[in-house]
Amino acid sequence: MDSRRSLLVLALIFISFLVYQQWQLDKNPPVQTEQTTSITATSDVPASSPSNSQAIADSQTRGRIITLENDVFRLKIDTLGGDVISSELLKYDAELDSKTPFELLKDTKEHIYIAQSGLIGKNGIDTRSGRAQYQIEGDNFKLAEGQESLSVPLLFEKDGVTYQKIFVLKRGSYDLGVDYKIDNQSGQAIEVEPYGQLKHSIVESSGNVAMPTYTGGAYSSSETNYKKYSFADMQDNNLSIDTKAGWVAVLQHYFVSAWIPNQDVNNQLYTITDSKNNVASIGYRGPVVTIPAGSQETITSSLWTGPKLQNQMATVANNLDLTVDYGWAWFIAKPLFWLLTFIQGIVSNWGLAIICVTIVVKAILYPLTKAQYTSMAKMRILQPKMQEMRERFGDDRQRMSQEMMKLYKEEKVNPLGGCLPILLQMPIFIALYWTFLEAVELRHAPFFGWIQDLSAQDPYYILPILMGISMFLLQKMSPTPVTDPTQQKVMNFMPLIFMVFFLWFPSGLVLYWLVSNLITIAQQQLIYRGLEKKGLHSRKK
């Protein structure tokens, strides 16, 4: 297969990939739930049982707002229920060079995205008639220098029972401990069920065909390591899964919020949809906890609200790092990301790291590239003999095919040898594509000059234009036996078509393709020199 036909194959694979991406974005079939849910569509918390449906009243006024802060995030807590209504990520700007922290969780008139938790059940303190109004002295709580963790207890007392909702902040971590300590001095046993949920305005996933981004739910259970559950899925079928281990999450491009309940007990994962208010919730409900009179009980859970940091999330909960979704190319994307990170740690620039990774990839593929050009050179030499066979055997395709295979064997030529490097390069390209869409480390990562965000498109389209020029040069420098005028015109337009597609791709990905083309041109000239010495190639066309 000659270079230009290889380019056509590459274009077809590339366009098919983009079409598939858009189809996945537009048509995500609903997941069938494992059992019928007992959660009502208007509920704000899960029902404790089918016959005892409890809910939070949406009309309640807000309590006092307190602020919790460590070195990576700043949280706002509503003392009415103890919900997390805001999370500002101090190490991530909202926009490039804005100096304003990115706010992940937030509650405004236009948009709601909050993390709720509470106690329901027979003696629950979060009911349709009201929620616990916690008390605490002070409004601002900050992890001090040299302090590794900070516990902030909210207090609520009712009928001889003392409830403490304790928030635990840790240095350098987006993992927030949310524990309940219950002291029952009421004279009789009480029963409660813990729950945690993420409440989010129903929105469509953003992005475009080149850079689609997912906003929606996800969960992990004992049977399913990781599964997206979109807002459309929630509207079609409320989720209800019983599992011993697992978590629920809402994904938003480079960021994620996730409730992780006690992994040693059975929990129900669920969703609730409120079409009237255009809101959906995904959460968990724990088992009934009985606290005898005169006894104490502690119920643990944690909330991750922050960037998709794979290494940290892997230590918080099993499979939470899978929210960094590399798609089917994960087995390539993970080592590539590791290599990118390793090199970036040395060169301190993600753009230079991309260039270095490109050099490594092209060096690894060089033997195949050399075999590709050698195979194409031999195929060109065989063209007269192949044409003679076509004329000799005419319509006898079976005989012609047999004779051609015999010729390939005698001349030691692999007719598919030119395809292999192309087929290997596409998965690498797709893996890098998903890396740029998913790895928060590349968000707002500068290169130099006008490229200040390698995860975004080139604002002046300089890299895509250079990439198109490099493809044009590579095509012109590659000899081809293509004689059909129509096919020739299609091939001539390929660099332009690719350039247009790449206008909206992450600039880091375009940089990879540009450098790859330049290296291929250099490798091509080196290989051609060797082929000329063997009489397999002539620079004269």
Swiss-Prot record:
The signal peptide annotation in the UniProt record is none
Q: What's the superkingdom here? A: Bacteria
Protein localization: Cell inner membrane
**Biological processes annotated in GO:** protein insertion into membrane; protein transport
> Which Pfam family is one of those matched by this entry?
60KD_IMP
Membrane topology, record value: Multi-pass membrane protein
The terms describing its cellular component in GO are:
plasma membrane
Q: Which InterPro entries does the UniProt record give?
A: Membr_insert_YidC, Membr_insert_YidC_N, YidC/ALB3/OXA1/COX18, YidC/Oxa/ALB_C, YidC_ALB_C, YidC_periplasmic_sf
Q: Which residues form a coiled coil?
A: none
What keywords does the record list, in alphabetical order? Cell inner membrane, Cell membrane, Chaperone, Membrane, Protein transport, Transmembrane, Transmembrane helix, Transport
CDD domains in the cross-refs: 5TM_YidC_Alb3, EcYidC-like_peri
Entry keyword annotation includes Cell inner membrane: yes
Record field: transmembrane: 6-26, 337-357, 416-436, 454-474, 495-515
Q: Where is this region: Disordered?
A: 34-56
Molecular-function GO terms, alphabetical: membrane insertase activity
Physiological role: Required for the insertion and/or proper folding and/or complex formation of integral membrane proteins into the membrane. Involved in integration of membrane proteins that insert both dependently and independently of the Sec translocase complex, as well as at least some lipoproteins. Aids folding of multispanning membrane proteins.
Description of how the protein assembles with itself and partners = Interacts with the Sec translocase complex via SecD. Specifically interacts with transmembrane segments of nascent integral membrane proteins during membrane integration.
Q: Which PANTHER family match?
A: CYTOCHROME C OXIDASE ASSEMBLY PROTEIN COX18, MITOCHONDRIAL, OXA1
What is stated as this protein's family in its record?
Belongs to the OXA1/ALB3/YidC family. Type 1 subfamily.
Name the HAMAP family on file.
Answer: YidC_type1 (MF_01810)
Could you tell me what this protein is called?
Answer: Membrane protein insertase YidC
| Phylogenetic lineage | Bacteria, Pseudomonadati, Pseudomonadota, Gammaproteobacteria, Pasteurellales
